């Protein structure tokens, strides 16, 4: 097995320096000072005059990574900013051994007094210096960054060090998740955690990852949704719940899909589909406001998107019929099969009328939905957890939110009739036996929970990765996931 590729000259020089340091007692020491907050230091002292620091001694200490050096001036990256340290020639000569073995990329700790340079830059004049960590590899160029995209994702730690835009994206992602929590917490929702390992496949239509639970001698699934356990909590009297967590779907990855992703699902007792659509729309507006984004003229994927106006709402079968110039309502299954063949739509053995209507929607309508649009009224065959429409039982009280041709949210008027739910699960088993690998299984424990009585409720799921793509204006999901899944690297 290959342990390490051949070292280049720079790597060998650094290892030789580390050997010298170790011989003289260096052992990757712990930090020794209480560190100051550099953001606060900048805010408090950056506008002070040079004379202020001659009259007032302000001592600070901090640690960070050495990223540039110009004579006695050392630029240290710490606490998400760059701070300049002045280390006199006399101090360097006094500590000649350490500085002779110092390289860019090393992590150092300094303390000393603040002063202003001739150009007015706030700096620290160092009187204590420690090497904390020796870097054995040179950092990528600060200007060019990591040019190979695959290497950028594999070595995200380097990308974040040298690419300020990447670092900004992930700090913003964290803020987005925090704001989502604020939005729901302020409305009395309770954040909960439900199991990642599930004995029964359900809550969505997706291929699962399967693992083996040794102590139970049983296969388990990594969850494909959090829906069913959250709805059990509605039965338990928790009227407003949400969960932010990882979801796993054993499917392909592309610019908008990753097999492991983060979602939020929220459920509200006594809310109908209209209320949940309004709630989702309000969440988007809340995020735009708190992130200081322009909702009326938002640029994404070379398109102008208007989030200020009320989101459009269209019935699925009506808009699909219109854009296809084909009456889906009056067509029978044979008509739809014939139309599918003409349009190059693949027909699976388990397809019924509703499956084909959905495929036509995906082909003819979905790519055209640029501004935020709710599509309402999905076929019952593809919506086993949503209430059927009392005025048209072949369709459901379900909606999806589309932006820029992509799905961003999926919401239901939740099915709470246990008899109907069991029947839907049984229909899913028939589909599975006919080859639908994404069909759900019968979750008898969930059905039994419904038998105790679940209040009428609405619920919604939103992919946080795709939402972050939108709000940070990134067109690849890999840009908003710290360590995205990649194909194995070839030797």
Swiss-Prot record:
One GO-annotated biological process of the protein: lysyl-tRNA aminoacylation
Pfam families attached to this UniProt entry: tRNA-synt_2
CDD domains: LysRS_core, LysRS_N
GO cellular component, one term: cytosol
Descriptive protein name: Lysine--tRNA ligase
Cofactor(s) of this protein: Mg(2+)
HAMAP family according to UniProt: Lys_tRNA_synth_class2 (MF_00252)
Cofactor note: Binds 3 Mg(2+) ions per subunit.
Family: Belongs to the class-II aminoacyl-tRNA synthetase family.
Lineage of the species this protein comes from: Bacteria, Bacillati, Mycoplasmatota, Mycoplasmoidales, Metamycoplasmataceae
Organism expressing this protein natively: Mesomycoplasma hyopneumoniae (strain J / ATCC 25934 / NCTC 10110)
Residue ranges crossing the lipid bilayer per the database entry: none
